[in-house]
Amino acid sequence: MAIQTVTDAIRYVGVDDNTLALFENQYSVQPMGVSYNSYVILDEKIAVMDSVDARATEEWLSNVARVLEGRRPDYLVVTHMEPDHSGSLMRLAQKYPEMKIVGNAKTFTLIKQFFGTGALSEERMLEVGEGSTLSLGSHRLRFLLVPMVHWPEVMAAYEEEEKILFSADAFGRFGSLERTARAPWAPQARRYYYNIVGKYGAQVQALLKKISALEIKTICPLHGPVLTEGLEECLRFYDLWSQWEPEESESILIAHASIHGNTAHAAKTLKGKLEKKGVQVNICDLTVTDLSYAVASAFYCGKLVLASATYDGELFPPMREFLEHLRTKGFRNRRVGLIEDGSWAPDAARLMRTKLEEMKDIHLYETVVSLRGALNQTSEAQMDALVAELCAE
């Protein structure tokens, strides 16, 4: 990705990765790619804000050198130690041995864990805490500790002169800058939030409280675009998401896991019945859809219908994995309907109910649609009763 100007004194020096298949080795980022963001503040003293994944080290070092134009950085500020942001840290530290590394106590613990206890001398470690400041000349960084958004060492840095928030992973988004420059922020930011940060809603609320007193003109996250417009909307989304509230309370996601197609047919039949009632319905085939999309859709909607086959006396694995993802991300406060299928011993509804009992404030609709291979008159009647319940609220 080309170097970009954020302001006269601040440059974007991050790198796009359009070849990565799975972010964190589990979430699809094709075809949109992902960006590893890094910034340079040019003043009397120079601060580099975070490094990038080791996959992108050489391009990043080249970007930094081009922006420096022969100068040498005074500081590398580490707001987040996850390897997609710290993977090139030591290469910059070795290239500029006089440069200090700025982090909090937990940052330096992780640096020693990742790179060895002797990777950095004590003289090179500049430890900061809540409210600490770092003057670069006309620019000054103020540090805000925001642990567990989404790692324990995470901190944000607020540049007081130009009112820029360097937000670490908060407000990040999937998508390389090259491929998604004109894409709306929310869809991939939502998928990123719920799958990466979503478990830590309380900690995100603490972050929002800390930054509510700040005048913010620009947000510079570690993934996705620099945000200069629509900041109130971005903050509103984060407030909503971090309280696990649906964006569309009357929308319904039907998530189905079908072995030979009968359960999928039932799910599609339910979708048609609901749409005839004027209900907005999303449908997701868990056997082929990347789970990160299904998880994001489940949080987006106010209601959820789960349709699963029974498999070897257990839940069909795609449904089991989906429910486990929802549990770990804090899924809660939803109304849920169940459809089960089993040619001789349908038991998926009981098994799904057991999984849902591990989540907070989940309310099940009374009607369960039970199939023995395919829809029949009895299960159609059950489905009509479930439709009535779904539309009654």
Regions found by a protein language model. Give the residues of each.
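Conserved beta-strand hairpin/beta-sheet module of binuclear metal-dependent hydrolase folds
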Residues: 3-66, 156-159, 163-167, 263
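Metal-dependent phosphodiesterase/nuclease catalytic metal-binding core
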Residues: 40, 156-192, 197-220, 229-256
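Short acidic active-site motifs
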Residues: 88, 290-294
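Active-site neighborhood of phospho(di)ester-bond hydrolases with catalytic His/Asp-centered motifs
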Residues: 49-51, 73-81, 100-104, 165-168, ...
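FMN-binding flavodoxin-like domain, especially the glycine-rich phosphate-binding loop
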Residues: 177-219, 223-226, 269-284, 294-393
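Short, charged N-terminal beta->alpha structural module
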Residues: 255-277
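Metallo-beta-lactamase
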Residues: 4-8, 102-154, 200-208
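Active-site metal-binding motif and surrounding structural segment of the metallo-beta-lactamase
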Residues: 44, 55-102
